[in-house]
């Protein structure tokens, strides 16, 4: 088959070529209709919007997005045209968990007794909540769609605003319908805060209204903001960037393990679509120094990944957002190391 792929999806081009396919790799932001005119399949990330404008009149019959989110895929159009598509749910949940852990530990030496609000308890949010409880935090979970489906133990967003020292956002981006998450954290949310929380957004930029967050920071309603995602990426609000405590270029999910998982998932879906056997991928490499001797979990997590380094890079060169994201040196997750706690 003729296949067009985003060149920044690791292992993908090589795996498809070894399976006998004709593959063209290019930047995701550059993919246009002429590139996919005679393609049978398309593999993308969030930067490639897949709808009528790109796909009308082309030969594309399969789209794989190597991401958890899929708001860049026009599902209705694909259904209308009989185009099969897949995403990679949960592929980088471990990486985003690692990011949130490192952000929290960079802010607090001791997390026991803190209250954490988790907005959205899907693959990522549920793992964040489980870790936080194990670390001794009081956790409040919010997820209206899951509450409507019968999940117990959930609270309102208002209760989280009233009770939490840290609030982290992990919902799917939904623009309309019964449970929209677009600007979920808006003027009313920030006005109802009671504990001047640390606010973390590693989901989608528009989940948090950037202008209202900036106003809340300026008024002291929010003590600090840790932002990995931004409205208008890659052209981000410079004033909000200046006020953000942690500011990274949409790389919370960028671990080698997460990228590997995503590629594996979309390849499996493509193989099922094409009616072929599985497509082989190489094993993940080991790390150079896998043994970590540390005093506590905090030391281990910040030793593996400290978000302040990426923050410095983005604040020093905000115009370089997309380049920093596309050329990010994929970090490794905790599972790649053997951790020994001293004493």
Q: What residue ranges belong to the model's regions?
A:
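Glycine-rich adenosine-cofactor-binding loop
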Residues: 7, 97, 114-133
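Phosphate-coordination loops involved in phosphoryl transfer and adenosine-cofactor binding
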Residues: 112-115, 196
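Oxidoreductase and adenylate-handling cofactor-binding alpha/beta cores
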Residues: 97-113, 134-135, 264-273
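N-terminal glycine-/charge-rich "phosphate-binding" loop or analogous flexible N-terminal tail
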Residues: 1-39
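Phosphate/diphosphate ligand-binding glycine-rich loop within oxidoreductases
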Residues: 40-111
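Rossmann-like dinucleotide-binding domain for NAD(H)/NADP(H)
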Residues: 196, 202-343
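NAD(P)-binding Rossmann-fold cofactor-contacting core
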Residues: 10, 134-151
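Rossmann-like adenosine-cofactor binding region
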Residues: 50-51, 146-238
């Amino acid at each position: 088959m003729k296949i067009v792929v985003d060149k920044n999806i690791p292992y993908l081009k090589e795996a498809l070529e070894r399976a006998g396919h004709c593959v063209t790799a290019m930047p995701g932001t550059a993919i246009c209709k002429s590139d996919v005119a005679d393609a049978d399949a398309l593999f993308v990330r969030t930067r490639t919007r897949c709808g009528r404008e790109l796909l009308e009149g082309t030969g594309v019959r399969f789209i794989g997005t190597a991401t958890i989110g899929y708001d860049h895929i026009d599902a209705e159009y694909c259904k209308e045209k009989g185009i099969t598509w897949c995403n990679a749910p949960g592929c980088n949940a471990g990486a985003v968990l690692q990011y949130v852990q490192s952000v929290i530990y960079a802010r607090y030496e001791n997390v026991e007794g803190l209250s954490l609000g988790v907005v959205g308890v899907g693959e990522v949010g549920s793992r964040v909540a489980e870790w936080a409880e194990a670390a001794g935090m009081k956790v409040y979970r919010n997820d209206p769609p899951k509450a409507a489906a019968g999940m117990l133990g959930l609270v309102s967003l208002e209760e989280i605003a009233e009770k939490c020292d840290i609030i982290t956002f992990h919902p799917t981006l939904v623009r309309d319908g019964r449970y929209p998450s677009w600007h979920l954290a808006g003027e009313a949310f920030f006005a109802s805060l009671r504990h001047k929380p640390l606010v973390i957004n590693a989901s989608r930029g528009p989940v948090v209204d950037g202008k209202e967050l900036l106003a809340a920071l300026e008024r002291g309603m929010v003590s600090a903001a840790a932002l990995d995602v931004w409205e208008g990426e890659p052209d981000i609000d410079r004033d909000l960037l200046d006020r953000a405590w942690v500011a990274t270029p949409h790389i919370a999910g960028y671990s080698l393990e997460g990228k590997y998982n995503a590629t594996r998932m979309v390849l499996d879906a493509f193989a099922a679509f094409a009616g072929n056997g599985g497509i082989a991928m190489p094993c993940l490499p080991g790390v150079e120094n896998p043994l970590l001797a540390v005093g506590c979990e905090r030391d281990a997590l910040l030793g593996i990944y400290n978000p302040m380094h990426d923050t410095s890079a983005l604040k020093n060169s905000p115009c370089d957002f997309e380049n920093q994201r596309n050329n990010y040196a994929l970090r490794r997750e905790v599972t790649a190391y053997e951790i020994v706690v001293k004493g």
